[in-house]
Design a protein with these regions (language model features):
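Extracellular/lumenal and peripheral-membrane lipid-interaction modules
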Residues: 3-289
Length: 289
Protein backbone atom coordinates (compact mmCIF):
# COMPACT_ATOMS: atom_id res chain seq x y z
CA UNK A 1 0.00 0.00 0.00
CA UNK A 2 2.77 2.46 0.86
CA UNK A 3 4.52 1.67 -2.42
CA UNK A 4 1.29 2.51 -4.22
CA UNK A 5 0.88 5.86 -2.47
CA UNK A 6 4.51 6.86 -2.92
CA UNK A 7 4.19 6.04 -6.60
CA UNK A 8 1.16 8.27 -7.04
CA UNK A 9 2.94 11.23 -5.47
CA UNK A 10 6.06 10.53 -7.52
CA UNK A 11 3.90 10.59 -10.63
CA UNK A 12 2.62 14.10 -9.83
CA UNK A 13 6.08 15.41 -9.00
CA UNK A 14 7.36 14.08 -12.31
CA UNK A 15 4.76 16.19 -14.09
CA UNK A 16 6.29 19.16 -12.25
CA UNK A 17 9.75 18.22 -13.49
CA UNK A 18 8.58 18.06 -17.09
CA UNK A 19 6.91 21.46 -16.86
CA UNK A 20 10.00 23.03 -15.26
CA UNK A 21 12.25 21.64 -17.97
CA UNK A 22 9.82 22.87 -20.60
CA UNK A 23 9.70 26.40 -19.15
CA UNK A 24 13.36 26.77 -18.25
CA UNK A 25 15.13 24.46 -20.68
CA UNK A 26 13.09 25.38 -23.70
CA UNK A 27 11.64 23.51 -26.64
CA UNK A 28 14.89 23.06 -28.55
CA UNK A 29 16.71 21.42 -25.63
CA UNK A 30 13.90 18.98 -24.86
CA UNK A 31 13.55 18.04 -28.49
CA UNK A 32 17.26 17.47 -29.02
CA UNK A 33 17.98 15.81 -25.67
CA UNK A 34 14.87 13.65 -25.29
CA UNK A 35 13.02 13.79 -28.61
CA UNK A 36 10.10 15.50 -26.85
CA UNK A 37 7.64 17.78 -28.62
CA UNK A 38 7.00 20.40 -25.93
CA UNK A 39 3.87 21.69 -27.65
CA UNK A 40 2.37 18.19 -27.51
CA UNK A 41 3.25 17.87 -23.81
CA UNK A 42 1.65 21.20 -22.90
CA UNK A 43 -1.45 20.31 -24.93
CA UNK A 44 -1.65 17.03 -23.02
CA UNK A 45 -1.34 18.88 -19.71
CA UNK A 46 -4.06 21.27 -20.86
CA UNK A 47 -6.37 18.32 -21.54
CA UNK A 48 -5.53 16.81 -18.15
CA UNK A 49 -6.56 20.14 -16.58
CA UNK A 50 -10.02 20.06 -18.13
CA UNK A 51 -12.81 19.79 -15.57
CA UNK A 52 -14.42 16.36 -15.53
CA UNK A 53 -18.11 15.77 -14.95
CA UNK A 54 -17.98 12.36 -13.27
CA UNK A 55 -21.60 11.56 -14.10
CA UNK A 56 -20.76 11.85 -17.79
CA UNK A 57 -17.14 10.64 -17.77
CA UNK A 58 -17.46 7.54 -15.58
CA UNK A 59 -19.57 5.06 -17.52
CA UNK A 60 -19.85 2.36 -14.84
CA UNK A 61 -20.00 4.52 -11.73
CA UNK A 62 -20.96 2.71 -8.53
CA UNK A 63 -22.69 4.13 -5.46
CA UNK A 64 -23.73 3.20 -1.92
CA UNK A 65 -26.76 1.52 -3.45
CA UNK A 66 -24.39 -1.16 -4.73
CA UNK A 67 -23.14 -1.74 -1.18
CA UNK A 68 -26.73 -1.95 0.04
CA UNK A 69 -27.65 -4.48 -2.65
CA UNK A 70 -24.56 -6.55 -1.74
CA UNK A 71 -25.63 -6.46 1.91
CA UNK A 72 -29.01 -7.89 0.86
CA UNK A 73 -27.27 -11.13 -0.13
CA UNK A 74 -27.94 -13.34 2.89
CA UNK A 75 -24.37 -14.64 3.33
CA UNK A 76 -22.99 -11.08 3.23
CA UNK A 77 -25.64 -9.46 5.42
CA UNK A 78 -23.37 -9.27 8.46
CA UNK A 79 -20.18 -8.72 6.43
CA UNK A 80 -21.30 -5.36 5.05
CA UNK A 81 -22.58 -3.07 7.78
CA UNK A 82 -24.03 0.42 7.40
CA UNK A 83 -23.12 2.67 10.30
CA UNK A 84 -25.29 5.36 11.84
CA UNK A 85 -23.29 8.13 10.14
CA UNK A 86 -23.88 6.62 6.70
CA UNK A 87 -20.42 5.06 6.37
CA UNK A 88 -19.85 1.34 5.88
CA UNK A 89 -17.75 -1.32 7.59
CA UNK A 90 -16.58 -4.51 5.86
CA UNK A 91 -15.93 -7.43 8.23
CA UNK A 92 -15.20 -10.72 6.38
CA UNK A 93 -15.09 -12.64 9.68
CA UNK A 94 -18.88 -12.32 9.91
CA UNK A 95 -19.57 -14.31 6.74
CA UNK A 96 -22.49 -16.73 6.99
CA UNK A 97 -22.43 -20.17 5.41
CA UNK A 98 -22.98 -19.96 1.66
CA UNK A 99 -26.09 -21.72 0.45
CA UNK A 100 -25.04 -21.07 -3.15
CA UNK A 101 -22.43 -19.17 -5.14
CA UNK A 102 -22.45 -15.39 -4.63
CA UNK A 103 -22.78 -13.33 -7.82
CA UNK A 104 -21.53 -9.74 -7.58
CA UNK A 105 -21.65 -7.18 -10.39
CA UNK A 106 -18.64 -5.06 -11.27
CA UNK A 107 -20.38 -2.09 -9.62
CA UNK A 108 -20.86 -4.06 -6.40
CA UNK A 109 -17.22 -5.16 -6.44
CA UNK A 110 -16.12 -1.58 -7.10
CA UNK A 111 -18.08 -0.35 -4.09
CA UNK A 112 -16.72 -3.11 -1.84
CA UNK A 113 -13.09 -2.69 -2.96
CA UNK A 114 -13.31 1.08 -2.51
CA UNK A 115 -14.47 0.65 1.10
CA UNK A 116 -11.62 -1.77 1.83
CA UNK A 117 -9.18 0.59 0.09
CA UNK A 118 -10.35 3.51 2.26
CA UNK A 119 -9.92 1.48 5.45
CA UNK A 120 -6.38 0.51 4.38
CA UNK A 121 -5.67 4.21 3.90
CA UNK A 122 -6.98 5.05 7.36
CA UNK A 123 -4.82 2.35 8.94
CA UNK A 124 -1.56 2.65 7.03
CA UNK A 125 -1.57 5.76 4.87
CA UNK A 126 -2.66 8.72 6.99
CA UNK A 127 0.24 10.88 5.80
CA UNK A 128 -1.12 10.50 2.26
CA UNK A 129 -4.78 11.13 3.10
CA UNK A 130 -4.58 14.69 1.76
CA UNK A 131 -4.30 13.20 -1.74
CA UNK A 132 -7.56 11.32 -1.12
CA UNK A 133 -7.04 8.46 -3.59
CA UNK A 134 -10.32 6.64 -4.20
CA UNK A 135 -11.60 3.97 -6.55
CA UNK A 136 -14.23 5.44 -8.88
CA UNK A 137 -14.96 2.62 -11.31
CA UNK A 138 -14.47 -1.11 -11.86
CA UNK A 139 -15.45 -3.05 -14.98
CA UNK A 140 -15.01 -6.64 -16.16
CA UNK A 141 -14.69 -7.55 -19.85
CA UNK A 142 -13.36 -10.26 -22.19
CA UNK A 143 -14.53 -12.93 -19.76
CA UNK A 144 -13.50 -16.53 -20.48
CA UNK A 145 -13.69 -19.61 -18.22
CA UNK A 146 -10.17 -18.90 -16.93
CA UNK A 147 -9.52 -15.18 -17.41
CA UNK A 148 -10.97 -11.68 -17.56
CA UNK A 149 -9.95 -8.10 -18.18
CA UNK A 150 -10.19 -6.03 -14.99
CA UNK A 151 -10.36 -2.24 -15.51
CA UNK A 152 -10.42 0.27 -12.67
CA UNK A 153 -10.26 4.04 -12.32
CA UNK A 154 -8.62 5.79 -9.37
CA UNK A 155 -9.09 9.50 -8.65
CA UNK A 156 -6.20 11.42 -7.08
CA UNK A 157 -6.54 14.90 -5.55
CA UNK A 158 -3.50 16.96 -6.59
CA UNK A 159 -4.65 20.33 -5.24
CA UNK A 160 -2.56 20.08 -2.07
CA UNK A 161 0.62 19.84 -4.16
CA UNK A 162 -0.10 23.31 -5.51
CA UNK A 163 -0.30 24.57 -1.92
CA UNK A 164 2.93 22.83 -0.88
CA UNK A 165 5.00 24.13 -3.79
CA UNK A 166 4.12 27.81 -3.41
CA UNK A 167 7.56 29.36 -3.96
CA UNK A 168 9.27 30.43 -7.17
CA UNK A 169 9.64 28.83 -9.72
CA UNK A 170 6.86 26.42 -8.67
CA UNK A 171 4.35 29.29 -8.50
CA UNK A 172 4.61 29.42 -12.30
CA UNK A 173 3.40 25.85 -12.58
CA UNK A 174 0.03 25.93 -10.85
CA UNK A 175 -1.88 26.33 -14.08
CA UNK A 176 -0.20 23.22 -15.48
CA UNK A 177 -0.92 20.86 -12.60
CA UNK A 178 -4.43 19.35 -12.67
CA UNK A 179 -6.54 19.54 -9.52
CA UNK A 180 -7.51 15.91 -10.03
CA UNK A 181 -6.04 13.00 -11.95
CA UNK A 182 -8.07 10.02 -13.08
CA UNK A 183 -5.82 7.01 -13.65
CA UNK A 184 -7.37 4.02 -15.46
CA UNK A 185 -5.65 0.69 -15.93
CA UNK A 186 -6.72 -2.53 -17.60
CA UNK A 187 -5.06 -5.78 -16.50
CA UNK A 188 -5.77 -9.38 -17.37
CA UNK A 189 -6.42 -11.81 -14.51
CA UNK A 190 -5.75 -15.45 -15.35
CA UNK A 191 -6.90 -18.14 -12.92
CA UNK A 192 -4.20 -20.74 -12.34
CA UNK A 193 -4.59 -24.37 -11.30
CA UNK A 194 -5.07 -24.00 -7.53
CA UNK A 195 -7.89 -22.11 -5.76
CA UNK A 196 -7.10 -18.42 -5.23
CA UNK A 197 -4.09 -18.64 -7.52
CA UNK A 198 -3.96 -16.07 -10.29
CA UNK A 199 -1.63 -14.21 -12.61
CA UNK A 200 -1.93 -10.48 -13.37
CA UNK A 201 -0.66 -8.98 -16.63
CA UNK A 202 -0.64 -5.42 -17.92
CA UNK A 203 -2.93 -4.50 -20.85
CA UNK A 204 -3.34 -0.71 -21.09
CA UNK A 205 -3.31 2.64 -19.26
CA UNK A 206 -5.32 5.85 -19.64
CA UNK A 207 -4.98 9.22 -17.88
CA UNK A 208 -8.02 11.47 -17.44
CA UNK A 209 -9.35 12.72 -20.82
CA UNK A 210 -6.23 11.86 -22.79
CA UNK A 211 -6.77 9.42 -25.65
CA UNK A 212 -4.92 6.10 -25.59
CA UNK A 213 -2.35 7.56 -28.00
CA UNK A 214 -1.91 10.73 -25.94
CA UNK A 215 -1.54 8.70 -22.74
CA UNK A 216 1.13 6.53 -24.37
CA UNK A 217 2.95 9.65 -25.58
CA UNK A 218 2.78 11.34 -22.17
CA UNK A 219 4.03 8.27 -20.30
CA UNK A 220 6.79 7.89 -22.87
CA UNK A 221 7.79 11.51 -22.22
CA UNK A 222 8.06 10.78 -18.50
CA UNK A 223 10.13 7.69 -19.26
CA UNK A 224 12.49 9.65 -21.52
CA UNK A 225 13.03 12.41 -18.95
CA UNK A 226 13.28 10.30 -15.78
CA UNK A 227 14.17 6.82 -17.06
CA UNK A 228 11.19 5.53 -15.06
CA UNK A 229 8.59 3.30 -16.69
CA UNK A 230 5.42 4.70 -15.14
CA UNK A 231 3.10 2.37 -17.05
CA UNK A 232 4.90 -0.51 -15.37
CA UNK A 233 4.85 1.35 -12.03
CA UNK A 234 1.08 1.84 -12.26
CA UNK A 235 0.65 -1.85 -13.05
CA UNK A 236 2.87 -3.17 -10.25
CA UNK A 237 1.79 -0.64 -7.62
CA UNK A 238 -1.87 0.02 -8.33
CA UNK A 239 -3.34 -2.86 -10.32
CA UNK A 240 -1.88 -5.59 -8.14
CA UNK A 241 -3.01 -3.76 -4.98
CA UNK A 242 -6.64 -3.46 -6.09
CA UNK A 243 -6.86 -6.96 -7.54
CA UNK A 244 -5.34 -8.42 -4.39
CA UNK A 245 -7.87 -6.45 -2.33
CA UNK A 246 -10.64 -8.05 -4.40
CA UNK A 247 -9.38 -11.65 -4.45
CA UNK A 248 -6.42 -12.33 -2.19
CA UNK A 249 -4.53 -15.54 -1.44
CA UNK A 250 -2.11 -17.01 1.09
CA UNK A 251 0.38 -14.28 0.17
CA UNK A 252 -2.21 -11.50 0.49
CA UNK A 253 -4.50 -12.68 3.26
CA UNK A 254 -6.44 -9.40 3.55
CA UNK A 255 -8.02 -9.87 0.12
CA UNK A 256 -11.82 -9.78 0.40
CA UNK A 257 -12.64 -13.21 -1.04
CA UNK A 258 -9.74 -15.04 0.57
CA UNK A 259 -10.65 -13.46 3.93
CA UNK A 260 -14.16 -14.89 3.58
CA UNK A 261 -12.69 -18.35 2.97
CA UNK A 262 -10.65 -18.29 6.19
CA UNK A 263 -13.87 -18.97 8.08
CA UNK A 264 -14.00 -22.72 7.42
CA UNK A 265 -17.77 -22.83 7.97
CA UNK A 266 -18.43 -20.26 5.24
CA UNK A 267 -17.92 -22.76 2.45
CA UNK A 268 -16.04 -20.22 0.29
CA UNK A 269 -13.55 -22.17 -1.82
CA UNK A 270 -12.53 -20.02 -4.79
CA UNK A 271 -13.53 -17.27 -7.21
CA UNK A 272 -14.32 -16.97 -10.92
CA UNK A 273 -15.80 -14.50 -13.42
CA UNK A 274 -18.93 -15.22 -15.45
CA UNK A 275 -21.05 -13.54 -18.10
CA UNK A 276 -24.71 -14.53 -18.18
CA UNK A 277 -27.51 -12.94 -20.23
CA UNK A 278 -25.31 -9.96 -21.02
CA UNK A 279 -24.45 -9.35 -17.35
CA UNK A 280 -20.90 -9.66 -15.99
CA UNK A 281 -20.24 -11.10 -12.55
CA UNK A 282 -17.51 -11.77 -10.05
CA UNK A 283 -18.48 -15.10 -8.48
CA UNK A 284 -17.52 -16.20 -4.97
CA UNK A 285 -17.65 -19.97 -5.30
CA UNK A 286 -19.11 -22.33 -2.75
CA UNK A 287 -17.46 -25.71 -2.21
CA UNK A 288 -18.33 -28.79 -0.23
CA UNK A 289 -17.89 -28.30 3.51
Amino acid sequence: MFKLLKFLIKFILTILIIVIIGLVGGCIYLNSAYGINVIDVFNQLKIMNEEINENEYIENKFSNEDLDSSKNISSLNNVINKNGDGTYTIDPDKISMLEEDIYLTDKQIGAIVNEIFKKEMEKNGQEYSKYNPEVKEVTFSNITPTSTYFTYMVKLDCSSIKEEYNTFPFTLLKNYIPNYLYLSMTSSITHLEKPFSYEINYVSTKISKLTDEQTFSFLNTIKNVTQLDFASEIYTSLSTTLINLMIGNENYEDGFTYSLSKNALSGVKDYTFKEENGNRYYVIKRGLI
